[in-house]
Each structure stands twice: as structure tokens, then as C-alpha cells.
Amino acid sequence: MSTAAAQTVGPSADYKISAEYTSTSPDGATKVEQYAKISPDGDYTWQFWARHGDQLTLLKPEQPDYAAGFRFTSDSQWLVRMQKTAAGEGTLYLYHFGPQGFVAATPKPLGELAWAYFNGRPDSRKIKKPDFHIDAGLLKGTDDNYRWMGEKWPDSRYLVITLSGDVLPNGRHSQLRSLRGWRCRYDLQHGRFDVPPDFAESNAKATAPRPE
């Protein structure tokens, strides 16, 4: 079976759509539909499908337990999946529209890449390394290119990602929120991260020490 044909098959019959989670691209051409399969024990497995005309594309990977949030860039060509993975934890996946529909745009989850970028920067040495409630989020603003932040960036060029994490309690301290919304920017055109100078004040607060 060809790739194109396989993409039109869609979810198997044991997956049922949860219509309340359906989201639509700004140009109206793509809908993201979320389907859940419930096991006899009541466990959920979620699949996410992008519907563009008569083409259905599975947005891998599937996810146990949790539905997801989705945001498109204003040009409708990029799609970010905001995925809860556990209580207080989450990551991001990035997809790009092409001949096969929306497909993964990065070899690893975008959230994982953002953490790797943070861990290579001096800010990471200012804090206790998070080992609990590890979360990567997408700051709102993809619809207006972050103009609400005062930015004047090109249309659909950048994403702003926030990172937060806790440190588990031990004999010396209680649970700590060691990183609180540290920001970086992802360049969709070139596939790389940076930290613009105007993020400095926010990131200083995100890494400021808290009493143990």
C-alpha cells in the first residue's frame, strides 16, 4: 500500500473521536482530530490525526492517558502539539505541512531539544537540576507572531518555548521549583534555538534562587 493510501485509512474502529478536542488551522484547511481507545480496565490511549481535504495523517506518537493541545502558526504551515505526559509534566512536538500532510519536523520531541539547549547554557548552572515535574510549554502568541510581547518578528518564523522543573525533596530541602518559565526561541526556518536579549529579565526571574 502506498504512503498516500495509508494516510487515508485513519484510526481503527476501536478509536472514537472526542469532538470537543478538535482544532482547526487559521486558513480552515486542516482539522486536528483526537481519538481515544479505552481498554477494559478504563485506560485511555490517544491518537491524533490531521485531516486536510481527503488526506488523513497520523501525528505520531500516540499517547497514553492524556489528550493534547494544538496550536498552528498563523500561516497554517506549522503545528505544535502540547502534550501532557504525567501529572505536572509535559513536552512539545512540532509538525510541518508538506506533500504527505503534517509530518514530524524534528527527529526528537521539540520539548526534549529545548531542554538539551537549556542544559548547554550558563543559566543551567545557576539552578539545581530539575528531576521532577519536567515541563516544556509553548508561550501563547503563534497567532499574532508574539506582538503582544512587543516583538516585531517575521510572520510564522519563531516559537517561544518555556521550561519549568522541580527538584525532589531530600533530607536538606523540601520540593523546590528550581526553574520557573525560562524562555527560549525556536527558529522554524533554520531549525535552531536562541535567547533574544529581551528575554534576559524574564529568564533572570526564572532562575533566581528560592529559599530551601
Walk through the language-model features, giving the residues of each.
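Acidic, small-residue rich beta-repeat scaffolds with periodic aromatic anchors
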Residues: 1-18, 91, 99-212
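Short glycine/acidic-enriched loop and turn motifs that connect beta-strands
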Residues: 37-41, 85-89, 166-170
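Residue-level detector of Asp-centered blade-edge/turn motifs that repeat once per structural unit
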Residues: 74-75
